């Protein structure tokens, strides 16, 4: 009997903020299970979930609009602590008798909050002190509207020069509201505030740990598939590798891993995957050479969304064919993780926009013949890596930079051709090799090369050549929801450029991408 790791849990109501998923990630980092639901849940659903506490997220709407989202009134009647963040604070204030107004002074970015009154939420938490000894907190604001009157049974805990009610509290009911975003790293003490709310005020134990998550996942897999056989597409990436190890632990030889060499992989990746999982870990692996099939399906296609859908469709076709060669395979396992789901579809509030479909999610056809097993779909990337370490996977593999499911299919811009993939593989291998040699690989969060379908004139010796262009991309990020371009040294970039142009015949120019996320995404397609 596995321990109930969902015993203490936090319910996060999503009002559509771009930061909502970060709130969930922070709560999980504190060792507490949480779920992210749409704001318009019913009282019965909340009762059934039985949360230890509720967090109301931020959102893009204005609480002053007549039809703007509101928290279910039961949230404030359930007898559990409630923490409103930004929009969540504003709707809490309005619903409990306070007042919110639109403001000409939009507060966006860094702000300093002065703590005026003692509160369980921020007691003993400070970044600095005022001249008269009052605590100051460095926070990140992102709001237009602001609370102009708090409910009568609340007190003002903190304020800024332009925001008189930056933190409000009803200590007796354990209701708290903050006008800033504690979940983002720019709010320096934000994690401590969330910890104070989740662990102390809600009294949640740290039951959500890698070892316990593994036990729970193994039990769920066994319950879902029983004695059925499962097929998994194993790419050697973090997500599919951890999925393979979890399934191997749960069902052993009833798992067949299919390694599809689709012609869209990194240099020497096929050999590395077969060696590690076949020879070292002893998993049952079928190697399927399918480069020609994928490239034929992609021929003539320039649209990024269409390419992702094609790659997803052909993957499923290959899996179906391999499954038919085996007896009674009823389940297709995938390494879908929580950010895949978040980025691929609008949130249940309908406020988030579809950015791109992931081949693990949006690219799967409705007529897929097998059931889906997705043991990682509620986990963030950092949780997946920690689970992988617990399962015995090597650190270097788990902390390798992310690689997209469609592979080079979305790193070759426009039409995908074998010639382009071969050039890109070699250029990318040089970039990664030089990053490791310069001890820069672990200092950036993700680095890769993009093939641009653009020819540029170059000079080699006494002759001119007219060859292809590649772009180097390196970013720094904590959560992959936002990212800064990495300021790599000029001499390093020059060395990489020289090597690529001299060693990869067919590339005449190398550029460096200096776009952040937002407005750009990390991948080009």
Curated annotation (Swiss-Prot):
It is an enzyme of class 6 (ligase). Pathway: Purine metabolism; GMP biosynthesis; GMP from XMP (L-Gln route): step 1/1. Keywords: ATP-binding, Glutamine amidotransferase, GMP biosynthesis, Ligase, Nucleotide-binding, Purine biosynthesis. The keyword Nucleotide-binding applies. GO terms for cellular component: cytosol. The active site is at residues 86, 181, 183. Residues 208-400 form the GMPS ATP-PPase domain. Catalyzes the synthesis of GMP from XMP. This is GMP synthase [glutamine-hydrolyzing]. The lineage of its organism: Bacteria, Pseudomonadati, Pseudomonadota, Gammaproteobacteria, Enterobacterales. The gene is guaA.
